[in-house]
Amino acid sequence: MPKRILEGVVVSDKGDKTVVVKVERTIVHPLLKKIVRRSKKYHAHDESNAYKAGEVARIVECAPKSKLKTWEVLPKASA
């Protein structure tokens, strides 16, 4: 099975080698038929401490690294 890749905004970079990424998605409400935004926060492993709060990061599933971390950030794309 392929690993999921999600994109979100880093909301916290306070932990050592850890960032918290907020991923937003849109759904259609089943009764109201209105588009609603939903978000979820993921703890992700950042080996090089490269990401700072406010930056856009892509995360990919990985084997569990700790109690909360089962995602890791992909390296920044070089421009």
UniProtKB/Swiss-Prot annotation:
GO cellular component: cytosolic small ribosomal subunit
Pfam family for this entry, one: Ribosomal_S17
GO function terms (MF aspect): rRNA binding; structural constituent of ribosome
Matching InterPro entries: NA-bd_OB-fold (IPR012340), Ribosomal_uS17 (IPR000266), Ribosomal_uS17_bact/chlr (IPR019984)
Keyword RNA-binding attached: yes
SUPFAM superfamilies assigned: Nucleic acid-binding proteins
UniProt xrefs under CDD domains: Ribosomal_uS17
Cytoplasm is among the record's keywords: no
GO biological process, one term: translation
Top-level taxon: Bacteria
Gene3D superfamilies per UniProt: Nucleic acid-binding proteins
Keywords: Ribonucleoprotein, Ribosomal protein, RNA-binding, rRNA-binding
Quaternary structure note: Part of the 30S ribosomal subunit.
Protein family: Belongs to the universal ribosomal protein uS17 family.
The protein's role, per its UniProt record: One of the primary rRNA binding proteins, it binds specifically to the 5'-end of 16S ribosomal RNA.
Protein name (Swiss-Prot/TrEMBL): Small ribosomal subunit protein uS17
Naturally occurring in which organism (per UniProt): Caulobacter sp. (strain K31)
Record lineage: Bacteria, Pseudomonadati, Pseudomonadota, Alphaproteobacteria, Caulobacterales
